[in-house]
Structure formats: structure tokens, C-alpha cells
Amino acid sequence: MSESGHSQPGLYGIERRRRWKEPGPGGPQNLSGPGGRERDYIAPWERERRDGSEETSTAVMQKTPIILSKPPAERSKQPPPPAAPAAPPAPAPLEKPIVLMKPREEGKGPAATTSTSTPEGTAPPPPAAPVPPKGEKEGQRPTQPVYQIQNRGMGTAAPAAMDPVVGQAKLLPPERMKHSIKLVDDQMNWCDSAIEYLLDQTDVLVVGVLGLQGTGKSMVMSLLSANTPEEDQRAYVFRAQSAEMKERGGNQTSGIDFFITQERIVFLDTQPILSPSILDHLINNDRKLPPEYNLPHTYVEMQSLQIAAFLFTVCHVVIVVQDWFTDLSLYRFLQTAEMVKPSTPSPSHESSSSSGSEEGAEYYPHLVFLQNKARREDFCPRKLRQMHLMIDQLMAHSHLRYKGTLSMLQCNVFPGLPPDFLDSEVNLFLMPFMDSETESETPPRAGPGSSPLFSLLPGYRGHPSFQSLVSKLRSQVMSMARPQLSHTILTEKNWFHYAARIWDGVKKSSALAEYSRLLA
């Protein structure tokens, strides 16, 4: 190579191999200066950069290696080389590649062509660019994490274009029930149709009801679940006793009915316990009894005990409805059902230790006594204290949680009474006649000597309105604690399978079989 830096004709022949063997001066050499070996290495790369332009001058070829060999800091300070102005006067056949290169040069100038080609060149990648991929990776560093975060936030289905119908189906609320369905039929057989309305979530409250015939169990459960007092009783989710059924002395509900609300609260309505109409149906229709029962009344009582023991095992709250105060046989029946109740593990160590050491590993639900069709004198504070005291004495030896979870004093039903008015407050709630609500709304006629102002005032009822009491009862029942029914946390579907096993175990219970033999 000559002193001017131009290559000799024999540069790539025998002379080049001979020059490699010639000893040179020791120490570092300037590879970027004229006469260095970098000049021989860069020449092929320059020929690739001249693919878009055939008329580039020799001076440009000499300056290009100098720009690439300098550090990046000095390269950015150096004025742009005159290679950019030579790009527009390109031949007609190469006009299209030059148009693709123009957007890259408008970003940061000609010197930043390789570094700025990534954001705009990713969609249409250039066909002939073997060297710029290194620059493209460097240019993508500030923008690549943005795309990765977006893909990660949208989940696994984001790149695959999720079906909008599937996405909307996941956001839709669960199917709403319009009426109750059978959980246990009149033949005391388990039904599996209720599982279609259940979900795989654990925040569920199960409320059951017990009571004698004609006390208003179905009406109370309908008002607590989905209906209002203003609606027609024929549209209730739990069908109430019709006037014809009342005249015949029959029962409306048979077996156990199931209903679940949008708030994921399960309501279980049951047939009347110790029902005379069921006993009359068994006797008059010559229905065959199971072989283990000899007498019809024994079979009716065992059916009632099975239902009560089942509710004491699978429910968080059990409401005992009665329409007069009080029937001692009802409390005796509750104690018997507690005795034959299936043994279940304690929900947690804390609850078993706090509820008492005598409970052991047993689970017991909250028990609420609902005095339906209460009269005006039942709301008298003195009568209220007597009812609480009597229930507390009758249930003194019970392990059921019959006190401490519901209070009429705290929900402002008796605003003039102090919170400590009742010495032993049990879970007792009073509900007046629903028919008396419309009768009391009609203003009484003013007498001949009375002021016309009193004719505009409503009549004295001695208690809040029926609708107000229903809303207070609903809020207190729905706010009760929801302890675990078994040693594991149950979802709605798991609760259904658990309840099916409990019902099968209750029907095959040895304790119930032994008790039926004692009755015979």
C-alpha cells in the first residue's frame, strides 16, 4: 500500500501475503489511520452500503471508516457526512429502496440511520441489511419493555385475540333463580338439579327454617330471599299455603326446597315438622311404610328428625318459626334433633375453644326464634323480657348458638329501651301480622267532637311497620358469621356434595334407628 492510502494492484495477490510476514514496528498500531489493516477489513462493508447508490465518490469511501471507528461520543458531535445529499439523485430503478430509507434519516440525521431504523422499520423490514440488526437491537431497548408489560398485563389470551363472546360471558352475573326447586322430594330422596345454579366460590351463607304446620315458614323465607310484602303471594319464590289448603288443613311444602340469591345466600324451606296433615295422608292413602317403621306417627316423627338433624349440620343459620308463645313439644323436638345430629369436625380451633370445652369437635349453627303473627301486647317490654327469660331457661342445656348473634334492641326496634334491659337476651325476633299492615294504614274516622287533625294520623300499632321489621330481620340474618361447616373450606358446589353425603348419612344413622326402636 502506498503512502497516500490507495491500494496497489497486487494488494490481494502474492504481495499481500508477503506483507503479512514482514516484521513491523512493535507496540500499538493505529488501525484506523492510513495504511492500517482496518482499511482492508472495512472495504467489503462499504460495498454493501453502496447497494443503494452507484455514484458515490471516492472521498465518501475514505471518510466512512473514520466515522465508524471513532467512539460513539465523538461520532455524535461530528457533522453529518455528505452521503445524505447524494441519496436523492438516485437512478429510477432504485427509487423505491431510497424512499424506504428516507424515513430513517429524518429521525436523527444521516449518522443515526442504523440506530433509528428500528421503531419505524419493524413493520416493513428492509430486505438487504445484514449489518444494521445490531443497531436495531440497541434501538429497541427503550421501547421493548413497554410491549412486554402490555402483553403481560393482558394475560395469556391477549396475543391470541380473545373471543368477545367468551369475554362477556365471564363478566355476566350468575343465572338468577326465579322460583325454588327441590333439594329433597316428598319421598325423601336427594335431587341433583340444584347444582346447576352453584359456583366455585366460598363466600356462601346457608339459611334453613323449621316450624310447625301453618306458621308461615315459606312466607318468611320468601320475604328474606327475593320478595317484598307488596308483591302477590302467588309470585313468591317459596309457594305459600293457599286459602284452599288452609281450609283443608293440608301442608303446602313437602320435602326440602332450595333457592339461592344473587348475593350467594342459600335458603332451604322445609315441610312442617310433626305435621298432622302428613300423618293423615299416610293413614288414609294406605301408603306403605319403610320396613324399619311399624307405625305411621313414628315415621312422621323420624322424617322430622331427619330434616332437623340435616339442617343442624349443613346450615349456618336455622330459623325456628312459631305463631304463638309457646309450644313445649317444639323445644323437646329441638333437643332430640340435636342429640341425633351427625357428628362433624369443628370448623377451627379458635371457635371450638371459644364456644366451650364441652362441645368438643361438634359444629352447631346459629338458632333464631321467630315469633310470627305477633300481637300488639307481645311488643310490650315486660312481655318481651318474659319471653327471653323462658327461652333461655328451656335452651339452657343446649349447645346450639341460640343467643348472642341477633338482637331487637340493637336494630332500634325499641328505641326507648337501654341495651342492658334484657338480662339474658336470646336470638328472638317478633314479626306482626302481614295483613294488619294494610288495615292500619286506613286512617280512622274522626269523631263528632274530635279534632280533624287526628283523622290524618295513622292508627297506633304498638310496633314498627311490617316492611321495616322484615328489612331489619334480613339485615341481621345476612350479617351473621359464616363459620366453616367442615374441617376444610367449602365452595358452593363442595357444599352441595357435602350436604348430599350428610343426607345419606342421616337416613342411615344408627342413632336415629335406635331412637325409632325406642318410640315403638
UniProtKB/Swiss-Prot annotation:
Kindly indicate whether the keyword Cell division belongs to this entry: no
Q: Which residues carry this modification: N-acetylserine?
A: 2
Region described as Disordered: 1-143
- UniProt lists compositionally biased (Low complexity) regions at 109-121
Q: How is it modified after translation?
A: Phosphorylated by SMG1.
> What cystine linkages occur within this chain?
none
Q: Name one GO biological process term.
A: heart development
* Residue ranges, compositional bias (Pro residues): 78-94, 122-133
Q: Which InterPro entries match?
A: P-loop_NTPase (IPR027417), SMG9 (IPR039177)
What are the transmembrane regions? none
In this UniProt entry, the residues modified to Phosphoserine are 2, 4, 7, 32, 53, 451
Give the record's keywords alphabetically: Acetylation, Nonsense-mediated mRNA decay, Phosphoprotein
List where Basic and acidic residues composition bias occurs.
36-53
- Assembly state and interactors? Self-associates to form homodimers and forms heterodimers with SMG8; these assembly forms may represent SMG1C intermediate forms. Component of the SMG1C complex composed of SMG1, SMG8 and SMG9. Self-associates to form homodimers and forms heterodimers with SMG8; these assembly forms may represent SMG1C intermediate forms. Interacts with DHX34; the interaction is RNA-independent.
Task of the protein: Involved in nonsense-mediated decay (NMD) of mRNAs containing premature stop codons. Is recruited by release factors to stalled ribosomes together with SMG1 and SMG8 (forming the SMG1C protein kinase complex) and, in the SMG1C complex, is required for the efficient association between SMG1 and SMG8. Plays a role in brain, heart, and eye development.
Q: Which family does it belong to?
A: Belongs to the SMG9 family.
Q: What is the protein name for this chain?
A: Nonsense-mediated mRNA decay factor SMG9
Organism of provenance = Bos taurus
